[in-house]
Design a protein with these regions (language model features):
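Acidic donor-binding/catalytic loop of UDP-sugar-dependent glycosyltransferases
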Residues: 54, 81, 102-115, 133, ...
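Glycine-rich, basic loop-to-helix element that forms the pyrophosphate-binding segment
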Residues: 74-90
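N-proximal low-complexity "stem/linker" segments adjacent to membrane-targeting elements
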Residues: 1-35
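A conserved acidic beta->alpha catalytic loop
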Residues: 40, 48-57, 99
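Short aromatic/hydrophobic "clamp" motif used to bind/position activated sugar donors
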Residues: 95
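Short beta-strand/loop segment that forms part of the nucleotide-sugar
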Residues: 41-50, 70-75
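Conserved donor NDP-sugar-binding/catalytic core segment of glycosyltransferases
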Residues: 107-139
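Conserved nucleotide-sugar donor-binding catalytic segment
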Residues: 16-17, 141-233
């Protein structure tokens, strides 16, 4: 099919890939959300696995209307193979995949392309997504997204990146590889970790996608096999025999099975399990969505900046606190605060402690407090902003509002 020649002013070409198999009830809405994007240099590949439910009629109708929509239909060995096929066929500098029951928000592709243009070192950008029900009605904003990227937490605790909100520079796939076709549930999580091990991964503030959640999703139907795959990925990347993900997703799998039983006892057990899951996840949080930090917060960064700048608020008057700054396991500074209010600290980063690739900088507080009787979180300070400056300044995580 003929492709519209790109113009220099159109920005880098973005290729969207949709893998699909017998998803006719949702497919048209997915295609419409891509076809109506306001980004001019767009390529769209629909990789169909041999559908027999009318999906091909929907695809043909849209492909006839929009010359940037291309498609093929043939049997494959699952979602990962279909997406990889799309990666190989794509001509875009930026690639993403959108499953055939998810949709993009208006302007999503343009905002992602603009963000990546402003952050040339970033190889994977992610944002927010809203969870919708079977009918497309919003349920909630995806609650696990972390605005400050943390490699350790991604590799060992949970996948906090909403897949349809992600956009990838295609060239990084030549370095780290495409999706592992042996994985059926965690292929995206595994790819995020492999990219983040070598290059900056950044959050950008935007509501980019709608993530559909209903009883027949592959995630819901995965059961124990999905849990075992999660455990294998977490073990591989964290080096831990029993990483936190082992327990968090094990409890989640049990709660999902209980969901099939509508008895009062099962509902009570399910509610109890989800409370435990939330406690487990919160225990490993660095920073809450409102900017409050737990006992420690870790920043992942790359290259070799000269200094780190941290801005925050210490809330307690006449209560002294010590804050250690630890670079790649070495404590390099300790700060003491005694008065409540805003603070700004600047830390010079010793060049001899910086790694060539991924680095970790930890800020650890000596005191915790509870904000009120109604807020039982154990907190240290509120993060306002952070930055790495000087040297080969790296891309780093986004600000906290």
């Amino acid at each position: 099919m003929r492709m519209t020649p790109p113009k220099d002013e159109d920005g880098p070409r973005v290729t969207i890939i949709t893998p699909s198999l017998n998803q006719a009830p949702y497919l048209e809405e997915t295609i419409r959300s891509v076809a109506t994007q306001d980004y001019p240099n767009l390529e769209y590949w629909i990789i169909d696995g041999g559908s027999t439910d009318g999906s091909l009629d929907i695809i043909r109708r849209w492909a006839d209307r929009f010359p940037f929509i291309r498609w093929l239909s043939e049997r494959d060995n699952g979602q990962s193979e279909a997406i990889n096929k799309g990666f190989r066929l794509s001509s875009g500098e930026i690639v993403a995949w959108l499953n055939s029951d998810d949709t993009y928000a208006a302007g999503a592709v343009r905002r992602a392309a603009e963000f990546l243009a402003a952050h040339p070192d970033c190889m994977l950008a992610y944002s927010d997504a809203v969870i919708v029900d079977d009918w497309g009605a919003p349920i909630e904003i995806y609650p696990h997204t972390q605005k400050i990227f943390n490699y350790r937490r991604l590799a060992s605790v949970s996948d906090y990146i909403a897949q349809p909100s992600t956009f990838i520079r295609k060239k990084v796939l030549d370095e780290v590889g495409m999706l592992d076709e042996g994985l059926h549930w965690c292929m995206d999580w595994d790819l995020w970790i492999r990219i983040a091990d070598k290059h900056p991964v950044l959050y950008f503030p935007s509501l980019t996608a709608r993530l559909r959640d209903y009883a027949q999703t592959k995630t819901r139907m995965g059961g124990r096999r999905r849990w075992m795959e999660i455990v294998s990925v977490a073990r591989k990347h964290s080096g831990q025999r029993f990483p936190p993900a082992y327990f968090i997703y094990g409890l989640e799998s049990t709660a999902t099975r209980l969901n099939l039983d509508r008895s009062v006892r099962s509902r009570i057990k399910r509610m109890f399990l989800f409370k435990i899951i939330k406690l487990c996840i919160d225990r490993h949080l660095d920073v809450f969505p409102d900017g409050w930090v737990t006992q420690k917060i870790e920043f992942s960064f790359y290259n070799a900046p000269a200094r780190f700048i941290l801005k925050g608020v210490w809330p307690l008057e006449n209560v002294p606190v010590l804050m250690d700054v630890v670079l790649n396991g070495h404590r390099i500074r300790t700060f003491r605060f005694e008065a409540a209010g805003m603070f700004t600290v600047t830390v010079e980063l010793p060049a001899e402690l910086l790694a060539a690739g991924r680095n970790a900088l930890l800020v650890r507080s000596s005191r915790l407090f509870r904000y009120s009787r109604h807020d039982r979180r154990r907190l240290s300070f509120r993060l306002i902003d952070h930055a790495f400056e000087g040297g080969a300044a790296p891309a780093t995580g986004g600000n906290i509002p």
